[in-house]
């Protein structure tokens, strides 16, 4: 089982991977999701402390994925 720190780091890596696969910038993802670019950077770095299930659904919608695909490997 992952620690909270490991979970946040892996979640952030997944988000960065999905964003880069789509050649999106942080600013573009910010516009699509309504999440501030600065906070998106912290999510990708694994340093954001306030993630919720809502974030999974927001990112799934932004990347046109199913929610379980966002948390792959977690």
Regions found by a protein language model. Give the residues of each.
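Residues within the alpha-helical elements of helix-turn-helix
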Residues: 21-22, 32, 62
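Residue-level signal for the short linker/turn that defines the boundary of a DNA-recognition helix
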Residues: 13, 23-24, 51-54
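DNA major-groove recognition helix of helix-turn-helix/homeodomain DNA-binding modules
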Residues: 54-69
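Conserved hydrophobic/aromatic packing and binding residues within compact polymer-binding modules
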Residues: 15, 29, 40-43, 70
């Amino acid at each position: 089982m992952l620690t909270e720190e490991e979970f946040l780091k892996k979640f952030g890596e997944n988000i960065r991977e999905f964003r880069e696969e789509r050649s999106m910038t942080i600013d573009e993802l910010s516009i699509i999701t309504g999440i501030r670019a600065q906070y998106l950077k912290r999510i990708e770095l694994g340093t954001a402390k306030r993630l919720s299930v809502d974030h999974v659904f927001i990112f799934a919608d932004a990347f046109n994925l199913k929610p379980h695909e966002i948390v792959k490997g977690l």
